Amino acid sequence: MIPLFKVFMSEDVIKPVNEVLMSGQITQGPQVELFETALKDFMGNPYILTLNSATAGLTLALRLLKNKDDRFQWPGFDEDTDIVLTPALTCFATTAAVLANHVKIRWLDVDLNTANIDLVDLKNKLSAHTKVIYLVHWGGNPVDLDGLRELQEYSLQKFGFRPMIVEDCAHAFGAEYNGSKIGGKASEGNICVFSLQAIKHLTTGDGGFITLPNEFLYDRCKLLRWYGIDRDKRNYKGKDLRLENDILEYGYKFHMNDINATLGLYNLPHMNDLLRKNRENAAYFDEQLKDVKGIQLMNTNTKCNSAYWLYTIRVLNGKKQEFMEKMKESGIMTSQVHNRNDINSCVKDFQEPLPNLDLLERELVCIPVGWWLSEDDIRSIIKNCHIN
Protein backbone atom coordinates (compact mmCIF):
# COMPACT_ATOMS: atom_id res chain seq x y z
CA MET A 1 0.00 0.00 0.00
CA ILE A 2 1.36 3.42 -0.97
CA PRO A 3 0.94 5.38 2.29
CA LEU A 4 -0.66 8.78 2.62
CA PHE A 5 1.71 9.61 5.49
CA LYS A 6 5.12 8.43 6.62
CA VAL A 7 7.32 9.27 9.60
CA PHE A 8 10.57 11.03 8.71
CA MET A 9 13.33 10.27 11.20
CA SER A 10 16.97 11.08 10.56
CA GLU A 11 19.52 8.41 11.40
CA ASP A 12 21.49 11.27 12.96
CA VAL A 13 19.17 11.25 16.00
CA ILE A 14 20.24 7.87 17.40
CA LYS A 15 23.49 8.83 19.15
CA PRO A 16 22.36 12.21 20.62
CA VAL A 17 19.04 10.77 21.84
CA ASN A 18 20.91 7.97 23.60
CA GLU A 19 23.19 10.57 25.21
CA VAL A 20 20.16 12.49 26.47
CA LEU A 21 18.55 9.31 27.82
CA MET A 22 21.70 8.51 29.81
CA SER A 23 22.36 12.10 30.91
CA GLY A 24 19.92 12.26 33.81
CA GLN A 25 18.36 15.37 32.22
CA ILE A 26 15.39 14.22 30.16
CA THR A 27 12.75 16.83 30.97
CA GLN A 28 12.95 20.44 29.73
CA GLY A 29 16.63 21.34 29.65
CA PRO A 30 19.48 22.35 27.34
CA GLN A 31 18.20 20.43 24.31
CA VAL A 32 14.91 22.34 24.41
CA GLU A 33 16.84 25.61 24.43
CA LEU A 34 19.00 24.47 21.49
CA PHE A 35 15.95 23.35 19.52
CA GLU A 36 14.14 26.62 20.14
CA THR A 37 17.19 28.55 18.93
CA ALA A 38 17.30 26.43 15.76
CA LEU A 39 13.58 27.01 15.15
CA LYS A 40 13.99 30.76 15.62
CA ASP A 41 16.71 30.76 12.97
CA PHE A 42 14.69 28.59 10.57
CA MET A 43 11.46 30.59 10.96
CA GLY A 44 13.03 34.05 11.22
CA ASN A 45 11.12 34.79 14.43
CA PRO A 46 12.73 35.42 17.84
CA TYR A 47 9.52 34.66 19.76
CA ILE A 48 9.18 30.87 19.61
CA LEU A 49 8.41 28.43 22.42
CA THR A 50 8.28 24.64 22.15
CA LEU A 51 5.35 22.73 23.66
CA ASN A 52 4.22 19.15 24.15
CA SER A 53 1.55 19.43 21.43
CA ALA A 54 -0.06 21.82 18.98
CA THR A 55 -3.28 21.39 20.96
CA ALA A 56 -1.47 22.94 23.92
CA GLY A 57 -0.41 25.86 21.74
CA LEU A 58 -3.89 26.47 20.38
CA THR A 59 -5.23 26.43 23.94
CA LEU A 60 -2.54 28.81 25.16
CA ALA A 61 -3.14 31.20 22.26
CA LEU A 62 -6.70 31.98 23.29
CA ARG A 63 -5.79 32.04 26.97
CA LEU A 64 -3.16 34.70 26.21
CA LEU A 65 -5.72 36.87 24.46
CA LYS A 66 -8.27 37.00 27.25
CA ASN A 67 -6.37 39.74 29.06
CA LYS A 68 -6.48 43.37 27.92
CA ASP A 69 -3.01 44.65 27.07
CA ASP A 70 -2.50 48.29 26.12
CA ARG A 71 1.14 47.62 25.24
CA PHE A 72 0.01 46.22 21.89
CA GLN A 73 -3.45 47.82 21.81
CA TRP A 74 -5.39 44.67 22.60
CA PRO A 75 -8.87 45.16 24.14
CA GLY A 76 -9.06 41.74 25.79
CA PHE A 77 -11.67 39.04 25.44
CA ASP A 78 -14.90 38.54 27.37
CA GLU A 79 -15.77 34.83 27.36
CA ASP A 80 -19.40 35.63 28.25
CA THR A 81 -20.08 37.82 25.21
CA ASP A 82 -17.25 37.51 22.68
CA ILE A 83 -16.88 34.77 20.08
CA VAL A 84 -14.22 32.98 18.09
CA LEU A 85 -14.61 32.43 14.37
CA THR A 86 -13.06 29.08 13.53
CA PRO A 87 -13.08 26.60 10.63
CA ALA A 88 -15.27 23.53 10.83
CA LEU A 89 -12.98 21.57 8.49
CA THR A 90 -9.97 20.86 10.70
CA CYS A 91 -8.53 18.47 13.23
CA PHE A 92 -10.68 18.57 16.36
CA ALA A 93 -7.69 20.03 18.23
CA THR A 94 -8.58 23.45 16.82
CA THR A 95 -12.09 23.25 18.21
CA ALA A 96 -11.02 21.63 21.49
CA ALA A 97 -8.73 24.59 22.22
CA VAL A 98 -11.63 27.02 21.92
CA LEU A 99 -13.90 24.85 24.08
CA ALA A 100 -11.16 24.53 26.71
CA ASN A 101 -11.26 28.31 27.08
CA HIS A 102 -15.06 28.28 27.54
CA VAL A 103 -15.64 30.51 24.54
CA LYS A 104 -18.51 30.63 22.05
CA ILE A 105 -17.88 29.41 18.51
CA ARG A 106 -19.07 30.59 15.12
CA TRP A 107 -18.10 28.31 12.28
CA LEU A 108 -16.50 29.56 9.10
CA ASP A 109 -17.44 28.02 5.78
CA VAL A 110 -14.77 26.83 3.34
CA ASP A 111 -13.51 28.24 0.07
CA LEU A 112 -14.34 25.49 -2.43
CA ASN A 113 -11.17 26.18 -4.42
CA THR A 114 -8.70 25.79 -1.53
CA ALA A 115 -10.50 24.15 1.45
CA ASN A 116 -9.27 27.13 3.49
CA ILE A 117 -11.64 29.54 5.22
CA ASP A 118 -14.00 31.52 2.99
CA LEU A 119 -13.13 35.20 3.47
CA VAL A 120 -16.52 36.33 2.16
CA ASP A 121 -18.24 34.26 4.84
CA LEU A 122 -15.77 35.60 7.39
CA LYS A 123 -16.57 39.22 6.52
CA ASN A 124 -20.29 38.55 6.86
CA LYS A 125 -19.75 37.08 10.34
CA LEU A 126 -17.55 39.85 11.74
CA SER A 127 -19.18 41.73 14.59
CA ALA A 128 -18.40 43.83 17.65
CA HIS A 129 -17.97 40.53 19.51
CA THR A 130 -15.55 38.90 17.04
CA LYS A 131 -12.26 39.31 18.86
CA VAL A 132 -10.36 36.25 17.62
CA ILE A 133 -10.22 34.36 14.32
CA TYR A 134 -8.73 30.88 14.09
CA LEU A 135 -7.68 29.59 10.69
CA VAL A 136 -6.09 26.47 9.25
CA HIS A 137 -3.73 26.42 6.27
CA TRP A 138 -5.34 23.35 4.72
CA GLY A 139 -2.77 20.82 3.52
CA GLY A 140 -0.01 23.39 3.98
CA ASN A 141 -1.48 25.85 1.44
CA PRO A 142 -1.58 29.29 3.12
CA VAL A 143 -4.75 31.27 3.59
CA ASP A 144 -4.95 34.60 1.74
CA LEU A 145 -3.26 36.59 4.51
CA ASP A 146 -3.42 39.88 2.60
CA GLY A 147 -7.17 39.50 2.26
CA LEU A 148 -7.38 38.64 5.93
CA ARG A 149 -5.49 41.80 6.90
CA GLU A 150 -7.92 43.84 4.83
CA LEU A 151 -10.74 42.34 6.90
CA GLN A 152 -8.89 43.23 10.11
CA GLU A 153 -8.79 46.84 8.90
CA TYR A 154 -12.48 46.63 7.99
CA SER A 155 -13.22 45.51 11.55
CA LEU A 156 -11.10 48.34 12.94
CA GLN A 157 -13.06 50.92 10.99
CA LYS A 158 -16.47 49.41 11.77
CA PHE A 159 -16.03 48.08 15.32
CA GLY A 160 -12.96 49.89 16.67
CA PHE A 161 -10.50 46.97 16.93
CA ARG A 162 -8.57 44.47 14.84
CA PRO A 163 -9.47 40.84 15.58
CA MET A 164 -6.45 38.77 16.57
CA ILE A 165 -5.50 35.98 14.17
CA VAL A 166 -4.47 32.55 15.45
CA GLU A 167 -3.00 30.46 12.64
CA ASP A 168 -3.31 26.71 13.10
CA CYS A 169 -0.20 25.72 11.15
CA ALA A 170 -0.37 22.00 11.89
CA HIS A 171 -0.23 21.29 8.14
CA ALA A 172 2.01 24.18 7.21
CA PHE A 173 5.57 23.77 8.50
CA GLY A 174 7.80 25.36 5.85
CA ALA A 175 4.95 27.00 3.92
CA GLU A 176 5.57 30.50 2.58
CA TYR A 177 3.49 33.54 1.74
CA ASN A 178 4.90 36.45 -0.28
CA GLY A 179 8.31 34.80 -0.06
CA SER A 180 8.38 34.63 3.75
CA LYS A 181 7.70 31.72 6.06
CA ILE A 182 4.36 31.17 7.73
CA GLY A 183 5.14 31.69 11.41
CA GLY A 184 7.81 34.23 10.47
CA LYS A 185 7.53 37.53 8.63
CA ALA A 186 4.52 36.31 6.60
CA SER A 187 2.52 35.99 9.84
CA GLU A 188 3.55 39.30 11.37
CA GLY A 189 1.11 40.32 14.11
CA ASN A 190 -0.43 36.84 14.41
CA ILE A 191 -0.04 33.93 16.80
CA CYS A 192 0.94 30.72 14.99
CA VAL A 193 0.86 27.17 16.29
CA PHE A 194 2.70 24.26 14.66
CA SER A 195 2.38 20.52 15.17
CA LEU A 196 5.44 18.29 15.53
CA GLN A 197 3.37 15.12 15.78
CA ALA A 198 4.67 11.86 14.30
CA ILE A 199 3.52 12.22 10.69
CA LYS A 200 4.17 15.93 10.23
CA HIS A 201 7.05 17.15 8.04
CA LEU A 202 9.13 17.91 11.14
CA THR A 203 8.50 15.54 14.01
CA THR A 204 9.69 15.33 17.58
CA GLY A 205 7.75 12.11 18.11
CA ASP A 206 5.03 14.30 19.52
CA GLY A 207 5.05 17.99 20.28
CA GLY A 208 4.48 21.45 18.89
CA PHE A 209 5.60 25.04 19.06
CA ILE A 210 4.03 28.47 19.17
CA THR A 211 5.23 31.70 17.58
CA LEU A 212 4.25 34.97 19.21
CA PRO A 213 4.00 38.45 17.65
CA ASN A 214 5.67 40.39 20.45
CA GLU A 215 7.81 40.14 23.56
CA PHE A 216 4.88 40.71 25.94
CA LEU A 217 2.95 37.63 24.80
CA TYR A 218 6.19 35.64 24.53
CA ASP A 219 7.14 36.31 28.15
CA ARG A 220 3.65 35.51 29.42
CA CYS A 221 3.40 32.35 27.34
CA LYS A 222 6.76 31.22 28.67
CA LEU A 223 5.29 31.31 32.18
CA LEU A 224 1.94 29.74 31.30
CA ARG A 225 3.49 26.70 29.62
CA TRP A 226 4.84 25.57 33.03
CA TYR A 227 2.23 26.30 35.71
CA GLY A 228 2.98 30.03 35.71
CA ILE A 229 6.48 29.46 37.10
CA ASP A 230 9.58 31.20 35.77
CA ARG A 231 12.03 28.39 34.93
CA ASP A 232 14.94 30.70 34.16
CA LYS A 233 17.47 29.69 36.81
CA ARG A 234 19.40 32.89 36.26
CA ASN A 235 16.67 34.73 38.13
CA TYR A 236 17.13 32.71 41.34
CA LYS A 237 20.83 33.14 42.16
CA GLY A 238 21.27 29.56 43.37
CA LYS A 239 17.90 29.26 45.12
CA ASP A 240 15.41 26.47 44.36
CA LEU A 241 13.08 27.79 41.64
CA ARG A 242 10.31 25.45 42.83
CA LEU A 243 10.27 27.15 46.24
CA GLU A 244 10.93 30.77 45.35
CA ASN A 245 7.98 31.45 43.05
CA ASP A 246 4.90 33.50 43.73
CA ILE A 247 2.59 32.26 40.97
CA LEU A 248 0.72 35.33 39.78
CA GLU A 249 -1.28 33.51 37.10
CA TYR A 250 -1.85 29.77 36.93
CA GLY A 251 -0.56 27.92 33.91
CA TYR A 252 -0.24 24.40 32.52
CA LYS A 253 2.24 21.57 32.07
CA PHE A 254 2.67 22.17 28.35
CA HIS A 255 6.47 22.28 27.99
CA MET A 256 8.55 20.04 25.72
CA ASN A 257 11.18 17.65 27.09
CA ASP A 258 14.79 17.12 26.02
CA ILE A 259 14.10 13.75 24.37
CA ASN A 260 11.54 15.23 21.96
CA ALA A 261 13.65 18.34 21.43
CA THR A 262 16.65 16.24 20.40
CA LEU A 263 14.59 14.47 17.75
CA GLY A 264 13.49 17.83 16.39
CA LEU A 265 16.96 19.33 16.51
CA TYR A 266 18.45 16.56 14.36
CA ASN A 267 15.49 16.26 11.99
CA LEU A 268 15.31 20.00 11.28
CA PRO A 269 18.38 20.18 8.97
CA HIS A 270 16.64 17.79 6.55
CA MET A 271 13.48 19.85 6.17
CA ASN A 272 14.41 21.95 3.14
CA ASP A 273 15.15 18.80 1.13
CA LEU A 274 11.95 17.16 2.32
CA LEU A 275 9.86 20.22 1.41
CA ARG A 276 11.52 20.46 -2.00
CA LYS A 277 10.62 16.84 -2.77
CA ASN A 278 6.98 17.29 -1.71
CA ARG A 279 6.70 20.40 -3.88
CA GLU A 280 8.26 18.65 -6.88
CA ASN A 281 5.78 15.79 -6.55
CA ALA A 282 2.86 18.20 -6.23
CA ALA A 283 3.94 20.21 -9.28
CA TYR A 284 4.14 17.00 -11.32
CA PHE A 285 0.67 15.95 -10.16
CA ASP A 286 -0.66 19.41 -11.09
CA GLU A 287 0.58 18.93 -14.63
CA GLN A 288 -0.46 15.29 -15.03
CA LEU A 289 -3.91 15.53 -13.41
CA LYS A 290 -5.13 18.92 -14.62
CA ASP A 291 -7.23 17.50 -17.46
CA VAL A 292 -8.56 14.34 -15.80
CA LYS A 293 -12.31 14.13 -16.28
CA GLY A 294 -14.20 14.01 -13.00
CA ILE A 295 -11.33 15.41 -10.92
CA GLN A 296 -10.89 19.06 -10.00
CA LEU A 297 -7.58 20.27 -8.58
CA MET A 298 -7.40 22.81 -5.77
CA ASN A 299 -6.12 26.32 -6.44
CA THR A 300 -2.88 27.72 -5.06
CA ASN A 301 -2.59 31.50 -4.70
CA THR A 302 0.42 32.80 -6.64
CA LYS A 303 1.58 34.44 -3.40
CA CYS A 304 1.72 31.03 -1.71
CA ASN A 305 4.33 28.31 -1.61
CA SER A 306 2.49 25.37 -0.09
CA ALA A 307 4.21 22.89 2.21
CA TYR A 308 2.10 20.13 0.62
CA TRP A 309 1.53 18.10 3.73
CA LEU A 310 -1.56 17.08 1.79
CA TYR A 311 -2.39 17.00 -1.90
CA THR A 312 -6.14 17.54 -2.11
CA ILE A 313 -8.44 16.93 -5.06
CA ARG A 314 -12.18 17.11 -5.60
CA VAL A 315 -13.78 13.97 -7.03
CA LEU A 316 -16.91 15.15 -8.82
CA ASN A 317 -20.26 13.64 -9.81
CA GLY A 318 -20.82 11.73 -6.58
CA LYS A 319 -17.90 9.39 -7.26
CA LYS A 320 -15.83 10.05 -4.11
CA GLN A 321 -16.41 6.75 -2.32
CA GLU A 322 -16.09 4.72 -5.50
CA PHE A 323 -12.82 6.51 -6.33
CA MET A 324 -11.39 5.88 -2.85
CA GLU A 325 -12.36 2.20 -2.91
CA LYS A 326 -10.76 1.66 -6.32
CA MET A 327 -7.59 3.46 -5.22
CA LYS A 328 -7.43 1.16 -2.20
CA GLU A 329 -7.84 -1.88 -4.44
CA SER A 330 -4.91 -0.54 -6.47
CA GLY A 331 -2.76 -0.25 -3.35
CA ILE A 332 -3.01 3.52 -2.89
CA MET A 333 -4.11 5.03 0.41
CA THR A 334 -6.48 8.01 0.25
CA SER A 335 -8.45 9.88 2.90
CA GLN A 336 -10.44 13.00 3.70
CA VAL A 337 -8.00 13.29 6.66
CA HIS A 338 -10.24 15.43 8.90
CA ASN A 339 -13.97 15.23 9.51
CA ARG A 340 -16.02 18.40 9.87
CA ASN A 341 -16.10 19.47 13.51
CA ASP A 342 -19.52 21.10 13.60
CA ILE A 343 -21.44 17.80 13.58
CA ASN A 344 -20.14 16.64 16.97
CA SER A 345 -22.56 16.49 19.89
CA CYS A 346 -20.33 18.60 22.13
CA VAL A 347 -20.74 21.61 19.80
CA LYS A 348 -24.39 21.12 18.84
CA ASP A 349 -25.31 24.54 20.28
CA PHE A 350 -23.16 26.28 17.65
CA GLN A 351 -24.48 24.64 14.49
CA GLU A 352 -25.32 26.83 11.50
CA PRO A 353 -25.55 26.38 7.72
CA LEU A 354 -22.23 25.83 5.92
CA PRO A 355 -23.29 25.20 2.31
CA ASN A 356 -19.80 25.13 0.80
CA LEU A 357 -18.62 22.56 3.32
CA ASP A 358 -21.74 20.48 2.69
CA LEU A 359 -20.63 20.23 -0.94
CA LEU A 360 -16.89 19.89 -0.38
CA GLU A 361 -17.13 17.03 2.10
CA ARG A 362 -18.86 14.98 -0.60
CA GLU A 363 -15.90 15.51 -2.94
CA LEU A 364 -12.69 16.06 -0.94
CA VAL A 365 -9.99 13.39 -1.22
CA CYS A 366 -6.28 13.54 -0.36
CA ILE A 367 -3.79 11.41 -2.29
CA PRO A 368 -0.15 10.63 -1.38
CA VAL A 369 2.34 13.37 -2.31
CA GLY A 370 5.21 12.97 0.15
CA TRP A 371 8.97 12.68 -0.08
CA TRP A 372 8.79 8.87 0.26
CA LEU A 373 7.11 8.29 -3.12
CA SER A 374 9.18 6.39 -5.67
CA GLU A 375 8.90 7.02 -9.41
CA ASP A 376 6.81 3.85 -9.67
CA ASP A 377 4.52 5.11 -6.88
CA ILE A 378 3.99 8.40 -8.67
CA ARG A 379 3.23 6.69 -11.98
CA SER A 380 0.76 4.38 -10.23
CA ILE A 381 -1.06 7.25 -8.53
CA ILE A 382 -1.37 9.20 -11.79
CA LYS A 383 -2.44 6.14 -13.78
CA ASN A 384 -5.13 5.21 -11.27
CA CYS A 385 -6.45 8.78 -11.03
CA HIS A 386 -6.96 8.64 -14.81
CA ILE A 387 -8.60 5.21 -14.71
CA ASN A 388 -10.80 5.70 -11.67
Residue positions per predicted region:
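PLP-dependent aminotransferase-like
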Residues: N67-A172, E176
